[in-house]
Amino acid sequence: VSRGIFSFNQGFDRIILEPVAKQYNKLPEKIKTGTGNFTSNIATLLSIPNFVLQGEFKQASDATFSFAINSTVGILGFGNPARALGFEVQKEDLGQTLGTYGVKGGCYFVLPILGPTTARDAIGMIGDTFMDPFATATWREKEFLSVSGSRPDYIAVKAAGAVDFRGDNVVNFDSLEKNSIDLYAS
C-alpha cells in the first residue's frame, strides 16, 4: 500500500509540485527569501507550545522573541531580523514532543501528498492542527474539522511553504531520483 501511495505522490510531484517549484525558482531571490521567512515565521507559532511541552523553556522564549521581532520589525515575517540578533529557531512538532515522552515511532507508512511518516508523527500531525494558532484562527468555527471549512489563507500558506521547500530542493531531489536504484527505499 505504501509503495502505491508513494507512486501517487511521485506523480503528484512530477505533474504539479515540481513544475510549480521550478517556476517559483525563477522569481527574484528576495521574493523567495521573503516567502521562506514568512512560512517559517508562521511555523514558529507551532514550535512554541511544543518547546514548552518538552520543557525547553529557553527555546520557547527564543522562539517567542523571534516570532515577535520578525512579525513586527520583519514586516509580518517576510524579513528575519531576529536571525541577525542571534535567534535561530528550530522547528518542533507534536511528533517530536511525543518522542521526548518516550512514545515510540511505530510503523512507517506513506500518506497521500504529505509523504512518509510514522504512526507517532501522523498522530502528531493531527494534534499539531489543533495546536496551531494560525490554523485555529483561519478555520471557520462551524466547520472546524472539515477541509471545506478551511479558509484559503491557511491553505495558501501551507502550499507556499511546500513550494518553497520543493524549490529549495529541486537539485537534491533530481539527484536522489537519478542516483537511486529504488527511490522508495531511499
PLM region spans:
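Charged/polar positions within long, soluble alpha-helices
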Residues: 17, 77-80, 135
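A structured, mid-to-C-terminal "fold-capping" secondary-structure block
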Residues: 102-186
